[in-house]
Amino acid sequence: MTHWFHRNPLKATAPVSFNYYGVVTGPSASKICNDLRSSRARLLELFTDLSCNPEMMKNAADSYFSLLQGFINSLDESTQESKLRYIQNFKWTDTLQGQVPSAQQDAVFELISMGFNVALWHTKYASRLAGKENITEDEAKEVHRSLKIAAGIFKHLKESHIPKLITPAEKGRDLESRLIEAYVIQCQAEAQEVTIARAIELKHAPGLIAALAYETANFYQKADHTLSSLEPAYSAKWRKYLHLKMCFYTAYAYCYHGETLLASDKCGEAIRSLQEAEKLYAKAEALCKEYGETKGPGPTVKPSGHLFFRKLGNLVKNTLEKCQRENGFIYFQKIPTEAPQLELKANYGLVEPIPFEFPPTSAQWTPETLAAFDLTKRPKDDSTKPKPEEEVKPVKEPDIKPQKDTGCYIS
């Protein structure tokens, strides 16, 4: 599915040295600081490494997060926070407002922001894998799984960690509830697209495909609605994508619902359902053009050029013509003026996020190691704060060249 999924840019961050001169008083504390620095740098490198796979990402993320936990949680597993939580200032950009970074002197902010990027990496990995010329069944399962993992990470951040921030997220920033919720829903919707493609490939009952398409369209509508109160200057492009996907999958739902109605000898209603599918497909085509002309973060994808998109247009046209022929020869039923109400509920194939937890605190953290950080020796002019003029360079993401479109479904 090359050029099928819209992706916002990765978050960028200022370098962190983890050098605490005077504060670090022993070799074990010094080693932890060195390991934090190197594991953070390694994780940031992997975000743009095309050879990285989910196992490599998990290992690198766990390595960094388990060390970072010592800056957040107390070692005795009480509710008390670590004395080091506020020792370091972290600076991150946002996916929609990438040029203007946010900074917080809080290790929880770092945990959330880096976790957010790990989730984004999973969505980009899924998109890249889905764009392969001849995708295998195992690869399709990996696309499906990666999107569910991403949804689980976003959900966990929203429910368990963002509420712990001392400084609440500013409006329109990634950690604000509207944005992170939109990311959760989009991941679920895109994973369900894989399910729909699989159901079509295996020729499942039209009623099931219609219900899955309708549920997926509702996901996209919900995500779009979640972003509706954001500033259009940075949300318009993303919203166009969500809107066009909503129209596309509603058209799918009406198309397959029409087949179900025809099989039940309700030919007049089937024709009206397919007419609605035709109208929504045309609207999705128009929205594809508008999406391409809308400025905003992220590269522009081209869904209307994808064979999966065009195949629906042909399917709607052929099924409508078939229904009209049947009605002219056999049924002679009146065509309703109103489109049928879609009250479809899928009993199978609905996507739930894969639950996510950060790794426990690294075994390198011991009471002796923690004691080797002496905050009373911290310099008064705190050098851990980034200088005001320090620039956060955007992440240079690799260009993904679209491969030849074979029209293969993700199966």
Swiss-Prot record:
InterPro entries linked to this entry:
BRO1_dom, BRO1_sf, BROX
Provide the BRO1 domain boundaries. 90-408
Please tell me one Gene Ontology term that the record gives under cellular component.
Answer: nuclear membrane
What residue spans carry the region label Disordered? Answer: 374-411
Q: Basic and acidic residues: which segments have biased composition?
A: 375-404
Protein topology in the membrane = Lipid-anchor
Annotated lipid attachment (S-farnesyl cysteine): C408
Q: Does the keyword Nucleotide-binding apply?
A: no
The post-translation modification note in this UniProt entry reads: Farnesylation is required for nuclear envelope localization.
Tell me a GO biological process for this protein.
mitotic nuclear membrane reassembly
- Please list the residues that carry the modification N6-acetyllysine: K283
Q: Which Gene3D superfamilies match?
A: alix/aip1 like domains (1.25.40.280)
User: Where is it located?
Assistant: Nucleus membrane
* Swiss-Prot/TrEMBL keywords: Acetylation, Lipoprotein, Membrane, Methylation, Nucleus, Prenylation
Positions where Cysteine methyl ester occurs in the chain: C408
| Protein's UniProt keywords contain Acetylation | yes
Q: Name one Pfam family in it.
A: BRO1
- Residue ranges annotated as propeptide are 409-411
Q: How does it assemble?
A: Monomer. Interacts with CHMP4B. Interacts with CHMP5: this interaction allows the recruitment of BROX to cellular membranes. Interacts with SYN2; this interaction promotes SYN2 ubiquitination and facilitates the relaxation of mechanical stress imposed by compressive actin fibers at the rupture site.
Its biological purpose is as follows: Nuclear envelope-associated factor that is involved in the nuclear envelope ruptures during interphase (NERDI) repair, where it is locally recruited by CHMP5 and reduces cytoskeletal stress through its action on SYN2 to help reseal the ruptured membrane.
Q: Which family does it belong to?
A: Belongs to the BROX family.
Q: What is this protein called?
A: BRO1 domain-containing protein BROX
From which organism does this entry originate?
Pongo abelii
Biological classification of the source: Eukaryota, Metazoa, Chordata, Craniata, Vertebrata
